[in-house]
Regions:
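Core nucleotide-handling region used for phosphoryl-transfer chemistry
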Residues: 1-202
Length: 202
């Protein structure tokens, strides 16, 4: 978009430039979800207000909800395993009501395959390939050992459905406060200061 429409960025705009990692996109949230009313709720609804929504956890790939409680037909998908569920386990303790995290999962899959590769070369980012342990009859799969998470976007949705977008700087600070890793920030500031030798009139 920027290459096609460079004029959309003005000299006094605040911009953020971050590094691109090769992984798979994930989303984790604690948001208001439709809940299935039990018969006693329906009876109580005749006498008083019974909310039909409640805060609950959701996790997904870029397009598919992976939480089986909200997507009954969900499959293991492209990778044949729920790598998004593994990432969500890491992030769930940091989710407060209304918060949604957008991130890239990098490294290895629970099955031992690379999340992303090209020309036979895995983009492992220094993480170890999970190996079958004959003693426990399992393949250990640990965060920051076999896979990593890079948060690049955060939103907060209030009870009225209004969405607040964290700034790029707020994303960096939030991750730092929680001990999580954001995408690497290469530049943050005024567009005109990125290349100070170029006049804004040119």
């Amino acid at each position: 978009l920027i290459k096609k429409c460079p004029w959309i960025i003005k000299p006094n705009d605040i911009i953020s430039i971050t590094s691109k990692v090769h992984g798979t996109s994930g989303i984790s949230a604690d948001v208001l979800c439709k809940r299935q009313l039990k018969w006693k709720d329906k009876v109580a609804g005749w006498l008083t207000y019974v909310p039909d929504t409640a805060y609950d956890y959701l996790w997904s790939s870029r397009k598919v909800v992976k939480n089986q409680y909200y997507n009954k037909e969900v499959s293991e998908g492209y990778y044949g395993c729920d790598v998004w569920g593994e990432a969500h386990k890491v992030l769930q303790p940091f989710l407060t009501k209304g918060l949604t995290l957008y991130y890239e999962i990098i490294g290895w899959l629970p099955t031992g395959g690379a999340i992303q590769s090209m020309g036979g070369k895995a983009y492992d980012y220094g993480y170890d390939m999970p190996i079958w342990d004959p003693t426990t009859q399992t393949t250990p799969y640990k965060y920051n050992v076999h896979f990593g998470i890079r948060v690049y976007r955060i939103t907060y949705t209030n009870p009225d459905g209004i969405v607040y977008e964290f700034s790029a700087r707020q994303v960096q600070q939030w991750c730092k406060d929680k001990g999580l890793t954001p995408v690497t920030e290469l530049y943050y500031g005024y567009a005109k200061d990125l290349y100070p030798d170029i006049s804004v009139s040119e």
